[in-house]
């Protein structure tokens, strides 16, 4: 009873804090960037991380096993994973676009776990014999950490695609003002440039906007590649550890279970992303790789939630049913 009450308090504290963090982040983003608000945001994420950690430790002690036995616990752990990504970047003094993704993603997952699932699913589940293994912590934690990293990296790629394909992102050579300026240089007609003095001003403004968008695209691509590479590593470890665990439990490394199949498809898609991203011979490789990563975003949700909706296969223990 004491553990249940403590878990209830910790989940509501973490959800309340991260909700305030989101409000502060929106104020800092939409109104005016204030350093004090930014510091409050980071402290709020640390408090949220501490509360979720306290919940996981409490659930671990009360249940006697690592809290990854049902969908509710896995969602809480996913929220914890998103929080730790945010905090690690903050500790290393990285100011990047992941902050705008990790905090909302954490509140979404925790909010769904707290309010979207039935009360019965909040209770710790008794592990079936096949799950009573030390591989539970290794396999499931690696998979959820990979989901968190891959989701963040994929969302950065989606943002990159949106910015790239905006109608107003036509580069210098497609702009009429830049064409006029180019014409003046090509024909050496400096008088034309003097008569059209406003062209230089307009072109400079246009060049600045395009240069800013170019820098933003490169920044998003760089961080997307880093985070997806990390998530791909976790996913590989998770799949391999799951194969070893399956061999111990069922006598076979691979059974083409629905979740195993979709995990393999997800792994293949992100392997294609990494290959496309590293292959400099491909034209527009940034956009191509971002498109592949956006496909991976959908596959992650299918792999994580879709199989739970079906409630079939060896992984149906975490289903909604």
Swiss-Prot record:
GO function term, MF aspect, one: heme binding
Membrane-topology annotation of the record: Multi-pass membrane protein
GO biological process, one term: cytochrome complex assembly
Membrane-crossing residue ranges in chain numbering: 12-32, 45-62, 71-91, 98-117, 143-163, 227-247, 260-277, 292-312
GO terms under cellular component: chloroplast thylakoid membrane; plasma membrane
Keywords assigned by UniProt, alphabetized: Chloroplast, Cytochrome c-type biogenesis, Membrane, Plastid, Thylakoid, Transmembrane, Transmembrane helix
Location of the protein in the cell: Plastid, Chloroplast thylakoid membrane
Domain of life (superkingdom): Eukaryota
Keyword Cytoplasm: no
InterPro entries: Cyt_c_assembly, Cyt_c_biogenesis_CcsA, Cyt_c_biogenesis_CcsA/CcmC
Family to which this protein belongs: Belongs to the CcmF/CycK/Ccl1/NrfE/CcsA family.
Quaternary structure and interacting proteins, as annotated: May interact with Ccs1.
Protein's job: Required during biogenesis of c-type cytochromes (cytochrome c6 and cytochrome f) at the step of heme attachment.
Protein's UniProt name: Cytochrome c biogenesis protein CcsA
